[in-house]
Curated annotation (Swiss-Prot):
NCBIfam families registered for this protein in UniProt: PRK00114.1
PANTHER family hit by this protein: 33 KDA CHAPERONIN (PTHR30111:SF1)
Disulphide bridges, residue numbers: 239-241, 272-275
Lineage: Bacteria, Bacillati, Bacillota, Clostridia, Eubacteriales
Post-translation changes: Under oxidizing conditions two disulfide bonds are formed involving the reactive cysteines. Under reducing conditions zinc is bound to the reactive cysteines and the protein is inactive.
Identification of the protein by name: 33 kDa chaperonin
HAMAP family attached to this UniProt entry: HslO (MF_00117)
Region of interest (Disordered), residue spans: 300-319
Biological process per Gene Ontology, one example term: protein refolding
A Pfam match: HSP33
C-alpha cells in the first residue's frame, strides 16, 4: 500500500483536516540514517508532521522547517518540507537507544527528545524575513508539542496524532498522522465533541495495522459530520542536495578556514545531513574554490573603494 496524504473539511468547513500515511517514506528515511527503533519513531513522527505542514503551504516557493531539541539523547530532529508533500530530515543521534516507556510500553520518544528546550517552526514564505514561531517543549512526544505550537503560536485549536510502528526487524510496519483544526467561528461544543471522539478511538497506527486506509480512518472519526475529502497527494522523502550547493556552503566559510583546508592538502569528504550522500573535494577542487573566494573578496574591496571615492567627490562638490 503506497503512502497518501489527504486534505479534507467537515462540518461545513468549520473543521480542517490533514491526514497521511507515511509508512514507506519513514522506512526510507530510517534506512538512510541507520536508525534504531527509538530514533526511527522520533524522526518518523517529525517527518509525518512536516509532510502535513508542507501541505498547508500555499505556493511552491514556500518552505517550512521544523526543529525540536529538548536536550535529550536524540540530540534534536530537523525536518524541511515543501508544498508538493516532499520532505527531508535528520536526527542528531540516529543510534539513540532507550528502554520502552514504562507507562505505556511504547518507544520512549519523549525521553529521547527531552523537555529542556523548544519546538521551532520556520516558514519561508518568500518574504524579506521568514516567520519564526517557537514554543517550549510540552512533552517531547512531538504530537502534543505540535498541538501546543498551533494553539499558542498560531492561535488555531488543533488535535495532532503522530504514530510510527517499528517491526522486529527495525523496518517500519506503519506510520502516519493527522492534524485536525477548528477554524474561526466554529462552535465550542464542536471542539468538545472532537475531543470525546478522539479519546475513544484506537491509536492511528493500530487502525492502520488493522488494514484501514487513511481515508477510512478519517471517515471513522468524522462519521456523521459531513466529511468532504478535497484532495489527495503522495508524500515522498526527497533530498535536493547537489555538488553545487555543497560548493556554495564551502565558499560561505571564512577565507582563513578555506585556506587551511587547502594547505592541509587532504581530500575532504562532506556528507549531506539529509541523505548521507558524500561529496569529495581534492586539493585541486578546494584550490579552485579558494581562487573564487579571493576574487570575490577583491571585488568587494574594489566596490567599497569605488563607493568611498564617489562619496569623497560628492563632499568636494558640496564645498
Amino acid at each position: 500500500m503506497s503512502d497518501k496524504l489527504i486534505r479534507a473539511i467537515a462540518k461545513d468547513g468549520m473543521i480542517r483536516i490533514f491526514a497521511t500515511e507515511t509508512t514507506e517514506l519513514v522506512d526510507e528515511a530510517s534506512k538512510i540514517h541507520d536508525c534504531t527503533p527509538t530514533a526511527a519513531a522520533a524522526l518518523g513522527r517529525m517527518l509525518t508532521a512536516g509532510t502535513m505542514m508542507g501541505a498547508m503551504l500555499k505556493s511552491d516557493k514556500e518552505v517550512v522547517t521544523l526543529q525540536i531539541n529538548g536536550g535529550g539523547m536524540a540530540k534534536g530532529v530537523t525536518v524541511t518540507a515543501y508544498s508538493d508533500c516532499s520532505v527531508k530530515g535528520y536526527i542528531g543521534n540516529p543510534h539513540v537507544d532507550l528502554p520502552l516507556n514504562t507507562e505505556n510500553g511504547k518507544l520512549n520518544v519523549g525521553e529521547a527528545i527531552g523537555k529542556n528546550g523548544g519546538l521551532t517552526v520556520i516558514k519561508d514564505l518568500g518574504l524579506k524575513d521568514p516567520y519564526v514561531g517557537q514554543v517550549p517543549i510540552y512533552s517531547g512526544e512531538i504530537a502534543e508539542d505540535l498541538a501546543y505550537y498551533f494553539t499558542a503560536s498560531e492561535q488555531i485549536p488543533s488535535a495532532v496524532a503522530l504514530g510510527v510502528l517499528v517491526d522486529r526487524d527495525h523496518s517500519i510496519k506503519k506510520a502516519g498522522g493527522f492534524i485536525i483544526q477548528l477554524l474561526p467561528g466554529a462552535d465550542e461544543l464542536l471542539g468538545d465533541l472532537l475531543t470525546y471522539r478522539l479519546d475513544e478511538i484506537p491509536s492511528l497506527t493500530t487502525m492502520l495495522s488493522e488494514g484501514k486506509t487513511i481515508e477510512e480512518v478519517i471517515e471513522f472519526i468524522f462519521d456523521g459530520m459531513d466529511l468532504k475529502i478535497l484532495e489527495e497527494e503522495t508524500p515522498k522523502y526527497k533530498c535536493d542536495c547537489s555538488r553545487e550547493k555543497v560548493e556554495r556552503a564551502l565558499l560561505s566559510i571564512g577565507y582563513k578556514d578555506l585556506k587551511e583546508l587547502y594547505d592541509e592538502g587532504k581530500e575532504e569528504e562532506l556528507k549531506c545531513h539529509f541523505c548521507n550522500k558524500a561529496y569529495k573535494f581534492t586539493k585541486e577542487d578546494i584550490g579552485k574554490l579558494l581562487e573564487e573566494k579571493e576574487k570575490s573578496i577583491a571585488d568587494e574591496v574594489s566596490e567599497e573603494m569605488k563607493k568611498a571615492e564617489e562619496k569623497e567627490k560628492e563632499e568636494k562638490n558640496k564645498k
